[in-house]
């Protein structure tokens, strides 16, 4: 019988089988490591990890409400409104009305919200007579509605100086869903009869500091 040098003995099949089993188990654990080591899954809901000592917390810096809402609204206007009303919101003078100085945009907030969310059917007059406006509210979030309303009312020469808060926008979505003709465009008659009023909800001071992503107050306001 040949005697092998010390340290060069052949590995037994039992050892190889055990190593293979360990490799399979380890692979299964590491394969699910996305959840095992995921911050959102490892810690309970609502837990917030604090930054290490001496390390500044990252994230968007708070902004004044009016500026933050306007920024959000600018994106929505470019995506949903600019195609018809134009980049300057002046319309084309025939089919698409101007939003500059518009009583519809600058007037009662519930009426304005209903037009944005549901569209407008039938002739309406704002110095000139216009026809149909398609609805823009499909999939629109309260933050987006609040942003676009605030943006239009404080841009293009409009100077309302107010903020349509997320709370007010949520109320608008609820009012829209509860309409008798929910799912259909509003008419001038319906607007006059039911929606010439201010949206309910807490009024947000334009100088209140908010999270620019959620548009929710983060405490205090800029002096």
PLM feature spans:
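Flexible coil segments in periplasmic/lumen-exposed cytochrome c-class electron-transfer proteins
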Residues: 128-131, 135-138, 142-223
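Electrostatic cytochrome c docking/interface patches
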Residues: 45-77, 92-95
């Amino acid at each position: 019988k040949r005697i092998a040098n010390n340290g060069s003995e052949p590995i037994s099949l039992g050892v190889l089988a055990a190593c293979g089993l360990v490799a399979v188990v380890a692979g299964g654990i590491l394969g699910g490591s996305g959840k095992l080591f995921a911050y959102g899954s490892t810690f309970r809901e609502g837990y917030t990890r604090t930054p290490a000592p001496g390390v500044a917390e990252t994230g968007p810096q708070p902004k004044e409400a009016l500026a933050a809402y306007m920024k959000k609204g600018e994106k929505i206007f470019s995506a949903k409104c600019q195609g018809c009303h134009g980049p300057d919101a002046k319309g084309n003078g025939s089919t698409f009305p101007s939003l500059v100085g518009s009583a519809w945009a600058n007037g009662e907030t519930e009426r304005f919200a209903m037009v944005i969310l549901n569209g407008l059917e039938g002739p309406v007059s704002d110095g000139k007579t216009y026809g149909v406006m398609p609805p823009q509210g499909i999939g629109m979030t309260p933050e987006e509605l609040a942003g676009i309303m605030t943006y239009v009312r404080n841009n293009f020469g409009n100077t309302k100086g107010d903020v349509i808060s997320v709370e007010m926008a949520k109320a608008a979505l609820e009012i829209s869903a509860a309409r008798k003709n929910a799912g259909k465009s509003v008419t001038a008659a319906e607007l006059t009869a039911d929606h010439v009023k201010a949206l309910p909800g807490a009024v947000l001071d334009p100088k209140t500091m908010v999270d620019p992503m959620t548009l929710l107050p983060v405490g205090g306001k800029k002096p």
